[in-house]
Amino acid sequence: MKIIGGPASQLLASRTARALGTEPVLCEFNRFPDGELYLRIADEIENEKVTIIQSTPTDSDFVALLQLIDACEGAAEINVVIPYMGYARQDKKFKPGESISARAIARCINASRIFTINIHERSILDHFPCPAVNLDAASLVGEYIAGSGLENPMLVAPDEGAQGLVKNVAAGHGFDHDHLQKTRLSGDTVVIKTKNLDVTGRHVVLVDDMIATGGTMAESVRMLKAQGAIDVHLACVHPVLTRNAALRLFNAGVKDIIATDTLEKAESLLSVAPLIAEALKRL
């Protein structure tokens, strides 16, 4: 199995290759004077099984993925791992005339099989023109929290939609878990608090699949601290963290931010490489 890392996932590809006892394939990435992307696979892959690992947080990264798939023509098998898939949040029409961007992107990516990691909406997998599997990094996040030294942490989902992820993170560790609920007290007064459990005197870990602007999370952090939490930590799979999101969160009182390397950020403290490697070993 040859591992090829795209420009957005160089470290993750290297870690995955190491977990499989091999080295990543060498590639050249450059840009033409007009800004167009140039890439070349420098190693021989003819009749080999290859796996491309490339997140697509930007349009350019998506183009790079398409180019890498095309450059692998002649390989015996082409697997594609998209650790973080951009445009996945536009999985339905919110207004008449809109594009379902996740569907449009998925339809363009064809390979022997595709792997995603905690994709925002699982129904997107049905739009790929080939078999697609979603891997769950929840156990990795749970293991990290268990080894972090936090005493009796409480895991909290920011909304009902993230409850499934929080339950999976807590599984096998006995962590208490709950989700936040908004209660409108008046026309302009809304209180955010845990639905069932009291956060007073607890180390709280807010868990979600991704953190983007951090606005909602920052408000939740302030509320939890005001309600008596000792401290509030954030854990996510995908650290999108646009613009000044990290600064906004720390200003709100977050103790720390824990994320995986589906996107390579300063907050990427744990790697999904073992998860990818295990999936590839099963092929």
From Swiss-Prot:
Any coiled-coil regions, as ranges: none
Ligand binding (Mg(2+) 2): 159
Its EC number(s): 2.7.6.1
Binding residues annotated for Mg(2+) 1, in chain numbering: 120
Function text: Involved in the biosynthesis of the central metabolite phospho-alpha-D-ribosyl-1-pyrophosphate (PRPP) via the transfer of pyrophosphoryl group from ATP to 1-hydroxyl of ribose-5-phosphate (Rib-5-P).
CDD domains the UniProt entry points to: PRTases_typeI
This protein's name: Ribose-phosphate pyrophosphokinase
Keywords recorded for this protein, A-Z: ATP-binding, Cytoplasm, Kinase, Magnesium, Metal-binding, Nucleotide biosynthesis, Nucleotide-binding, Transferase
